[in-house]
């Protein structure tokens, strides 16, 4: 496993980890991609609780979560990097079934809070990405419009219209 460290804060952040995965897939560095993804999926991913299906935005380099909230730009970049990996290298097993992992992330972003406690990252009233799930305002830097057309083709069928 491997992580990218924020050298100003001495932690690993979803923004840096997901950007690193995007760089790796674009440079055809599968081994490094898998190492970063495994670290993120092992230590940052939240399996249960209010933010189930999201990633803790900051972790110590030991893997301990600094915060249990997501920074939604990380979820977007994780999903797109995983879709690109699926198209470049094909899908593997478990967490390396890249396209399924990406679809799961997007599904959480749209559906969290519908059947159990939680909030979506994508605002259902205006379709804008939220700054954090529990707040109904956005951060323009989180808008990855260049991703949305591909998400509409590769997401779960029921999520494509979103």
Regions found by a protein language model. Give the residues of each.
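Internal, well-ordered domain-core segments that constitute the primary functional module
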Residues: 76-106
């Amino acid at each position: 496993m491997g992580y990218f460290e924020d050298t100003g804060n001495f932690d690993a952040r979803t923004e840096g980890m997901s950007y690193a995965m995007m760089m790796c897939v674009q440079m055809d560095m599968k081994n490094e991609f898998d190492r970063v993804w495994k670290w993120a999926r092992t230590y940052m991913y939240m399996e249960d609780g209010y933010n189930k299906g999201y990633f803790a935005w900051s972790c110590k380099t030991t893997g301990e979560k600094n915060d249990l909230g997501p920074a939604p730009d990380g979820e977007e970049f994780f999903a797109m990097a995983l879709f690109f990996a699926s198209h470049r290298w094909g899908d593997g097993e478990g967490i390396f079934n890249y396209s399924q992992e990406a679809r799961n992330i997007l599904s959480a972003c749209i559906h969290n809070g519908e059947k159990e406690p939680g909030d979506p990252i994508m605002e259902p009233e205006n379709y804008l990405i939220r700054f954090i799930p529990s707040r109904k305002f956005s951060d323009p830097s989180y808008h990855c419009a260049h991703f949305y057309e591909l998400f509409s083709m590769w997401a779960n069928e029921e999520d494509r219209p979103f």
